[in-house]
Swiss-Prot record:
Coiled coil: none annotated. It comes from Bos taurus (Bovine). Residues 1-46 form the signal peptide. It is found in: Cytoplasmic vesicle, Secretory vesicle; Secreted. This protein is produced by a bicistronic gene which also produces the ALEX protein from an overlapping reading frame. The gene is GNAS. Residues 167-177 have a biased composition (Low complexity). Residues 212-221 have a biased composition (Basic residues). InterPro entries: NESP55. This is Neuroendocrine secretory protein 55.
Length: 241
């Protein structure tokens, strides 16, 4: 009875297990367990990777802030860039002011060009009167200038006077005609002597030589000291009373 009862009990237990967990249900349960485990592992890996990225970003920020203290903020992340774009948009109305500044600069350049043109016109007006007087004397009659024939006449008169004078005759014996001819010359303006006349140039040279001979002072004649001079004799004895 016992031997027959044991296998019967085993069969009954199997039937009961199959009834509770059939083979199809077992396979589905195992698949669900594997899926849940894999999903949990993937989530853990994702969280660890995000944490590692955040740590690396924090380290980069601290490194950049340490080496670039002047920069207060580090380049933002892509999601924050949209907000920054919206922040930069209000700064666009500043463009008209910049255009106005350019317009003012152009007006300043125009005023400078006008000033330069005025200065050039003033310089031209200043230089114009300097050139005009040079052309005017050509058209208008100039001042009365003594004619050349008078100069030649005076030369001929002087030559004739020199010829009349003899080397032996004194200036007191000169004829009155020469004195009369010289008297009107004194009223006239002094004229330049022609250096070609050798006779006229010789006369003033001779007169200068005579004056030099007369005015030369006589040099004091010094007698040579005799061999018996007091300097060589020695000191003069002084008599004491």
């Amino acid at each position: 009875m016992d031997r027959r009862s044991r296998p019967q009990l085993g069969r009954r237990a199997r039937h009961n297990y199959n009834d509770l967990c059939p083979p199809i249900g077992r396979r589905a349960a195992t698949a669900l367990l594997w899926l849940s485990c894999s999903i949990a592992l993937l989530r853990a890996l994702a969280t660890s990777s995000t944490r590692a990225q955040q740590r690396a970003a924090a380290q980069r920020r601290t490194f950049l802030n340490a080496h670039h203290r002047s920069a207060a903020q580090v380049f933002p992340e892509p999601p924050e860039s949209d907000h920054e774009d919206t922040d930069f948009e209000p700064s666009l109305p500043e463009c008209p002011e910049y255009q106005e500044e350019e317009f003012d600069y152009e007006s300043e350049t125009e005023s400078e060009s006008e000033i330069e043109s005025e200065t050039e016109f003033e310089t031209e007006s200043d230089t114009a009167p300097t050139t005009e007087p040079e052309t005017e004397p050509e058209d208008e009659p100039g001042p009365v200038v003594p004619k050349r024939p008078t100069f030649h006449q005076s030369l001929t008169e002087r030559l004739s006077a020199l010829r009349l004078r003899s080397p032996d005759a004194s200036p007191s014996r000169a004829p009155p005609s020469t004195q009369e001819s010289e008297s009107p010359r004194q009223g006239e303006e002094p004229e330049d002597k022609d250096p070609r006349d050798p006779e006229e140039s010789e006369e003033p040279k001779e007169e200068e030589k005579q004056q030099q001979h007369r005015c030369k002072p006589k040099k004091p004649t010094r007698r040579d000291p005799s061999p018996e001079s007091p300097s060589k004799r020695g000191a003069i004895p002084i008599r004491r009373h």
